[in-house]
């Protein structure tokens, strides 16, 4: 039977001879990295950094200036004698090398330096960081280094999902060690309370982290097996000349082929709390007996749009990644590698927790972005795509070069698809076009055609899920928030977003209906039905009250006319159309590897 966690509204102090710690572990998303975003803002954006309060005209001017800076930095990169990253590089030279995009990079998504903060990074920036917050950079990224394709494409290797979970365990152990040293006297560490947050693959990492330190383990996830590796070389002389012969030594590895020190393994298995326990022991932070006496509670799990897309290949390198494994993935489809993630990562087995929250994207439908549901959590679906919910977009022009192409669909379908996106209020007709239409027709479909959409969008809609995540942590972790997210990432200046937030707040907190899109035909039909009901049931005619009235005791009371208050409200369907036109992005794109839509434009969902 699982343990029951009970929290009150106060922050109870531990006994004087005990240490109780609270730590929040933040796992950022794929190609999301707080440090790399800061470096781009420092070196590329500079005085042209785009602010949430900037007007459209201001943003467009800044975009042009930023692009000029980017072009200048490309010239500076080309002048560097050594393009490889070294320990002797200045921060700026390392930034130039790390943020540079080669030809192959440009066939995929932009890199982690070009993304804005996610909601994971935003909340981390708002929380107490010295004692509480532990930030783990996103899957496929390293601080001020080039992004790693093994992590980005497969969630694999040192920057993959499990690699980041192990890093989260090590960083948490380091934080525990630092806090433990601060305590004077003979105090004993007896309790650790963990909150964990994540977005995208970082959400999968946060859920797997909870399993790692708190879940009911499968044997295969804790068993350590013996293996061998090359530990050196011996030279032998042969008739053909000297020959280097490898020498092998015994090592111990976990299921991901991560080498561990057998001194801290118990009965052939990882210790209590998995890799967190292993690092606490191997770093001499606690003794075996102390570890056994520690209680660990997972208090809050807050995740945005869990996308695992995981297969552990280790650190493959380019040849294997684009070779056999890449061909298999391309031919067999994402389900071949990613269809078993729920079981592999034990995403439905985080162990006991007090509260879990999962915010998901209603309009995401890329083939590599299948959703993994979170049974037992407060799970709410919001309009928008992946990063509309978790963050990472910047304000500015969005160009989707290949929404759909004639390589995948016939011309008649492209026309139909374009009109569908107009009818569903993603684009105005002047924002979306089909290129090479005439040449395609006279060449009997042989000339390549594509649907391209270009529009200006704002990012601040993504602040709303962030605000809700903090609100759902009230009386749990909110005392660790130093600057409120509502203030730091405000939407008060916006004309529409406060109304949007009110509508979604009703859905999240008071059981209101999910905000679904209605077609224009459905909307007009509903309006006519409401008009008919009003005609059949007219409201009573308002009569101005007299200047005075009499109470029950016969006393005359003068009436006072109050100042009229005008409340501006938007019909939910009109507001949703504004959101789609001005705030919600379009993520699927056949122009970039790994960003293709599912053929039916519907999202695949696991873990239901």
Identify what each model region corresponds to.
Residues 1-608:
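Active-site- or binding-pocket-proximal scaffold segments within functional domains
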């Amino acid at each position: 039977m699982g343990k029951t966690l009970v929290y009150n509204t106060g922050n109870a102090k531990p006994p004087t001879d005990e240490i109780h710690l609270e730590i929040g572990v933040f796992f950022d998303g794929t190609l999301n990295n707080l440090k790399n975003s800061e470096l781009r803002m420092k070196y590329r954006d500079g005085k042209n950094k785009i602010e949430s309060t900037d007007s459209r005209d201001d943003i467009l001017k800044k975009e042009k200036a930023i692009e000029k800076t980017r072009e200048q930095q490309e010239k500076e990169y080309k002048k560097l004698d050594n393009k490889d990253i070294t320990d002797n590089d200045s921060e700026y030279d390392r930034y130039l090398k790390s943020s540079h995009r080669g030809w192959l990079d440009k066939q995929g998504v932009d890199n982690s330096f070009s993304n804005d903060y996610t909601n994971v990074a935003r909340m981390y920036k708002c929380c107490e960081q010295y004692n509480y917050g532990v930030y783990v950079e996103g899957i496929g990224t390293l601080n001020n280094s080039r992004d790693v394709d093994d992590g980005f494409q497969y969630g694999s290797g040192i920057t993959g999902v499990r690699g980041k979970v192990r890093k989260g365990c090590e960083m948490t152990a380091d934080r525990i060690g630092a806090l433990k040293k601060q305590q004077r006297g003979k105090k004993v560490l007896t309790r650790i309370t963990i909150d964990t947050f994540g977005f995208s693959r970082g959400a999968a990492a946060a859920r797997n982290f909870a399993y790692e330190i708190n879940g009911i383990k499968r044997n295969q996830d804790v068993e350590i097996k013996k293996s061998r590796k090359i530990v050196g070389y011996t030279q032998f002389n042969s008739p053909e000349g000297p020959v280097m012969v490898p020498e092998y030594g015994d090592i111990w590895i976990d299921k991901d082929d991560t080498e561990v020190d057998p001194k801290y393994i118990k009965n052939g298995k990882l210790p209590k709390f998995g890799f967190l326990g292993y690092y606490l022991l191997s770093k001499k932070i606690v003794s075996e007996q102390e570890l056994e006496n520690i209680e660990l509670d997972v208090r809050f799990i807050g995740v945005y749009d869990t996308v695992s897309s995981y297969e552990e290949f280790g650190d493959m390198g380019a040849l294997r990644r684009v070779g056999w494994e890449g061909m298999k993935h391309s031919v067999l489809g994402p389900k071949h590698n990613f269809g078993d993630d729920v079981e592999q990562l034990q995403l439905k087995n985080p162990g006991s927790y007090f509260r879990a929250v999962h915010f998901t994207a209603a309009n995401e439908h890329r083939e590599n972005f299948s959703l993994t549901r979170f049974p037992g959590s407060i799970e709410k679906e919001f309009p928008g795509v992946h990063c509309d919910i978790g963050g990472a977009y910047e304000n500015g022009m969005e160009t989707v070069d290949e929404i759909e192409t004639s390589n995948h669909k016939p011309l008649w379908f492209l026309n139909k698809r374009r009109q569908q996106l107009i009818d569903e209020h993603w684009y105005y007709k002047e924002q979306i076009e089909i290129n090479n239409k005439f040449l395609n027709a006279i060449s009997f479909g042989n000339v390549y055609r594509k649907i391209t959409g270009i529009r200006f969008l704002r990012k601040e809609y993504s602040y709303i899920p962030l605000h809700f995540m903090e609100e759902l942590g009230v009386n749990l972790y909110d005392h660790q928030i130093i600057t409120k997210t509502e203030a730091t990432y405000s939407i008060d200046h916006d004309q529409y977003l406060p109304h949007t937030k009110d509508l979604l707040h009703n859905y999240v907190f008071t059981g209101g209906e999910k905000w679904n899109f209605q077609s224009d035909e459905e909307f007009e039909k509903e309006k006519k039905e409401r008009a008919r009901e009003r005609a059949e049931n007219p409201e009573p005619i308002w009569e101005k009250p007299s200047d005075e009235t009499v109470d029950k005791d016969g006393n005359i009371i003068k009436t006072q006319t109050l100042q009229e208050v005008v409340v501006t409200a938007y019909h939910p369907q009109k507001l949703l159309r504004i959101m789609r036109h001005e705030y919600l992005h379009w993520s699927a794109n056949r122009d970039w590897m790994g960003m293709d839509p599912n053929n039916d434009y519907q999202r695949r969902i696991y873990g239901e």
